[in-house]
Amino acid sequence: MGQKVHPHGLRVGIIKEWDAKWYADKKNFADNLVEDNKIRKFVKKKGAIAGISKIQIERAAKRIKLNIFTAKPGMIIGKGGQGIEALKTELKKIVPDKVILINIVEVKVAEADAQLMAENIALQLEKRISFRRAMKQTIQRAMKSGIKGVKTTCSGRLGGAEIARSESYHEGTIPLQTLRADIDYGFAEADTTYGKIGVKVWVYKGEVLPVKKPVENKEEAKA
């Protein structure tokens, strides 16, 4: 049975970038990776209500730069930048020997961000809202924002059923095999009284076409 590859991982180096932008030798690689994981988990937990879509980490010598993509930048920045300073102080406990820089990037259309959509559906499931209603409402809002297509899947003991199953809804087109297609992917888990329910969201935002270089006139080139 064929399994779906992660849409972001498939397109890295083609139309997508790495979420971790650094290089380390064999000796330091594992430590850096563990640090990255701790930083991501902490920032995600700290800014749970701020709608954090993704966190990019850049490293250079003794410096770490975090690019935090969020739908509500004001909730992270705080009054007069107090939130940023408090976050830096907390992160210093994880990486005490490094200088931390934080850059906040606003997610303009939260309704079209796959990760935020998945987390929104998961939150509704935890509030005992019907999974079908949650998925359909999220899809409708996403399509109104001007995207080309969206697909959502919920897996687990849906509606408290004895046997776990998966249900999907989609609208528009989702060309998962087309490498130039800009596919955004998000995953979240809902902790319900019946157990965990996994939520996956695929969003198709259109094709990313390579920039064509202007062809020089042959006669001008000869001259």
UniProtKB/Swiss-Prot annotation:
A GO cellular-component term linked to this record: cytosolic small ribosomal subunit
GO molecular function annotations of the record: mRNA binding; rRNA binding; structural constituent of ribosome
Record-linked HAMAP family: Ribosomal_uS3_B
Occurrences of domain KH type-2 (ranges): 39-108
Domain of life assignment: Bacteria
Gene name of the record: rpsC
Binding partners and assembly: Part of the 30S ribosomal subunit. Forms a tight complex with proteins S10 and S14.
Protein name: Small ribosomal subunit protein uS3
NCBIfam families the UniProt entry points to: rpsC_bact
Family to which the UniProt record says this protein belongs: Belongs to the universal ribosomal protein uS3 family.
One annotated GO biological process: translation
Keyword field: Ribonucleoprotein, Ribosomal protein, RNA-binding, rRNA-binding
SUPFAM superfamilies attached to this UniProt entry: Prokaryotic type KH domain (KH-domain type II), Ribosomal protein S3 C-terminal domain
Organism from which the protein derives: Clostridium kluyveri (strain ATCC 8527 / DSM 555 / NBRC 12016 / NCIMB 10680 / K1)
